[in-house]
Amino acid sequence: MAKLGLNVDHIATVRQARGGSEPDPVTAAAIGELAGAEGITIHLREDRRHIQDRDLEILRRTVQTKLNLEMAATDEMVGIACRIRPEQCTLVPEKRQELTTEGGLDVLGNLAGITRATSSLREAGIVVSLFVDPTVEQIRASKESGADAIEIHTGRYAEARSEKSRHHELAAIREAIRLGNELGLTVHAGHGLNYVNILPLTGLAGIEEFNIGHSIISRAMLVGLDRAVREMVTLIRRP
């Protein structure tokens, strides 16, 4: 049965908007775990626009399930990760001008650097996942890099405007899951998923984890974080 990894980046986004100490992503993570999330995801960006080093350090000590650190494959971030040692690191592409991660990692085009980062992280006892588009080339390159897992970028599926386009993207995700499992990679999925578009994905065998943030935090503003997390967990676990 798939698990929910709750991304608390947007809690930090609200905090940073005023430069204060509230709301605290550490508190949000604890509420999320109590509500059924089986992992906490944060993205420590190079520009520190939301999650701060302090958040990572405290969450490493307080998260009771699994801490998943999203990060760029840079020497600085690899060094931080090897020092903090979260249970998992997910390597993602990063551009300073983007509002959020816009696409999958180009593993094929940056194989040497990603392999080097993956090796360093795995030597530190960290599970390594690569955030990739659902293409054969990127998934095979992910296996070649030595990664333990892939997180399928579901953004195109989430943004599809027609039924035909949605079916096309869903088919690509289904094939990506099949290939990932065939290659021995653990398969996760995330980006743009909400309480409606996740339903077709929960019926696909082979996905072990959904990483979701924006839609849950958005709903939490209306119904509270505990309820928002529980509702998503119920959808993911439905028979």
From Swiss-Prot:
<dbReference type="GO" id="GO:0005829">
    <property type="term" value="C:cytosol"/>
</dbReference>
<comment type="similarity">
    <text>Belongs to the PNP synthase family.</text>
</comment>
<comment type="pathway">
    <text>Cofactor biosynthesis; pyridoxine 5'-phosphate biosynthesis; pyridoxine 5'-phosphate from D-erythrose 4-phosphate: step 5/5.</text>
</comment>
<keyword id="KW-0664">Pyridoxine biosynthesis</keyword>
<keyword id="KW-0808">Transferase</keyword>
<feature type="binding site">
    <location>
        <position position="18"/>
    </location>
    <ligand>
        <name>3-amino-2-oxopropyl phosphate</name>
    </ligand>
</feature>
<feature type="binding site">
    <location>
        <begin position="9"/>
        <end position="10"/>
    </location>
    <ligand>
        <name>1-deoxy-D-xylulose 5-phosphate</name>
    </ligand>
</feature>
<feature type="binding site">
    <location>
        <position position="45"/>
    </location>
    <ligand>
        <name>1-deoxy-D-xylulose 5-phosphate</name>
    </ligand>
</feature>
<feature type="binding site">
    <location>
        <begin position="213"/>
        <end position="214"/>
    </location>
    <ligand>
        <name>3-amino-2-oxopropyl phosphate</name>
    </ligand>
</feature>
<feature type="binding site">
    <location>
        <position position="192"/>
    </location>
    <ligand>
        <name>3-amino-2-oxopropyl phosphate</name>
    </ligand>
</feature>
<feature type="binding site">
    <location>
        <position position="7"/>
    </location>
    <ligand>
        <name>3-amino-2-oxopropyl phosphate</name>
    </ligand>
</feature>
<feature type="active site" description="Proton acceptor">
    <location>
        <position position="70"/>
    </location>
</feature>
<feature type="active site" description="Proton donor">
    <location>
        <position position="191"/>
    </location>
</feature>
<keyword id="KW-0963">Cytoplasm</keyword>
<dbReference type="InterPro" id="IPR036130">
    <property type="entry name" value="Pyridoxine-5'_phos_synth"/>
</dbReference>
<comment type="function">
    <text>Catalyzes the complicated ring closure reaction between the two acyclic compounds 1-deoxy-D-xylulose-5-phosphate (DXP) and 3-amino-2-oxopropyl phosphate (1-amino-acetone-3-phosphate or AAP) to form pyridoxine 5'-phosphate (PNP) and inorganic phosphate.</text>
</comment>
<feature type="site" description="Transition state stabilizer">
    <location>
        <position position="151"/>
    </location>
</feature>
<protein>
    <recommendedName>
        <fullName>Pyridoxine 5'-phosphate synthase</fullName>
        <ecNumber>2.6.99.2</ecNumber>
    </recommendedName>
</protein>
<dbReference type="InterPro" id="IPR013785">
    <property type="entry name" value="Aldolase_TIM"/>
</dbReference>
<feature type="active site" description="Proton acceptor">
    <location>
        <position position="43"/>
    </location>
</feature>
<dbReference type="Pfam" id="PF03740">
    <property type="entry name" value="PdxJ"/>
</dbReference>
<dbReference type="GO" id="GO:0008615">
    <property type="term" value="P:pyridoxine biosynthetic process"/>
</dbReference>
<feature type="binding site">
    <location>
        <position position="100"/>
    </location>
    <ligand>
        <name>1-deoxy-D-xylulose 5-phosphate</name>
    </ligand>
</feature>
<dbReference type="InterPro" id="IPR004569">
    <property type="entry name" value="PyrdxlP_synth_PdxJ"/>
</dbReference>
<dbReference type="GO" id="GO:0033856">
    <property type="term" value="F:pyridoxine 5'-phosphate synthase activity"/>
</dbReference>
<feature type="binding site">
    <location>
        <position position="50"/>
    </location>
    <ligand>
        <name>1-deoxy-D-xylulose 5-phosphate</name>
    </ligand>
</feature>
<comment type="subunit">
    <text>Homooctamer; tetramer of dimers.</text>
</comment>
